[in-house]
Design a protein with these regions (language model features):
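Sec-exported extracytoplasmic/periplasmic mature domains
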Residues: 19, 36, 67-74, 106, ...
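Alpha/beta-hydrolase-fold catalytic nucleophile elbow
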Residues: 34, 79-82
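Conserved SGNH/GDSL esterase-like catalytic core that processes O-acyl groups on lipids
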Residues: 1-67, 87-103
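Conserved beta-strand termini and adjacent loop/short-helix elements that scaffold enzyme active sites
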Residues: 4, 81, 118-120
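Loop/turn elements at helix/coil->beta-strand transitions in domains of secreted/extracellular proteins
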Residues: 1, 27-31, 73-78, 112-116
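Extended, compositionally biased low-complexity polar/Lys-Gly-rich tracts
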Residues: 54-78, 113-114, 154
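Catalytic His-Asp segment of secreted/periplasmic serine-dependent ester chemistry enzymes
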Residues: 85-162
Length: 162
């Protein structure tokens, strides 16, 4: 398993790692891509020029990652996950931005060979769109319960890989 997501400007960092040896020598059947939320609120003491990206810019970066993955590992299926809900309440700016990103991604990826889009964020929310108790400590980073739900939501794709 290789985790390509790190703090910072995610698409640029992932593209750099893909171009510099990440995933070399392995041929996964399935790649699960989740990226983009960090770009909604970039702040850095090391680089004050960093600014938040728009949903369109984030989608552009994600599409570049998908293109690079398809070229690097042409036989792999790429499951692109929608940006998870973020922020304490529905209707907040991060929730709206995530919904926009997910809508754009779903449209762009529709019909793309070996690429599937899945918006599984609702597994973390109650019927009113609020995070369920114990899923996250800060309305962004998942706790154990959140990771369990994420893993369970991936079961249909993981079972098809075996």
């Amino acid at each position: 398993m290789s985790v390509l997501d790190r703090l910072g400007p995610v698409p640029v960092g992932i593209l750099w790692r893909l171009d510099n040896g990440e995933l070399d020598g392995i041929i996964p059947k399935l790649i699960v891509l989740l990226a983009g939320t960090n770009n909604l609120n970039l702040k850095s003491k090391l680089d004050p020029t960093l600014k938040a990206s728009t949903p369109d810019e984030i989608v552009e970066g994600l599409l570049a990652i998908i293109a690079r993955l398809r070229k690097k590992i042409p036989t792999a299926k790429i499951l692109t996950l929608g940006v998870f809900p973020r922020g304490p309440k529905p209707g907040g700016r991060f929730r709206i931005a995530a919904e926009k990103i997910n809508s754009l991604l779903a449209e762009w990826l529709k019909g793309m060979e070996r690429v599937e889009f899945a918006d599984i964020g609702k597994v973390f929310l109650d019927g009113d769109g609020n995070f369920e108790e114990g899923v996250t400590r800060d309305h962004l980073h998942l706790c154990d319960e959140g990771f369990k739900r994420w893993r369970k939501a991936l079961d249909p794709w993981l079972k098809n890989v075996r």
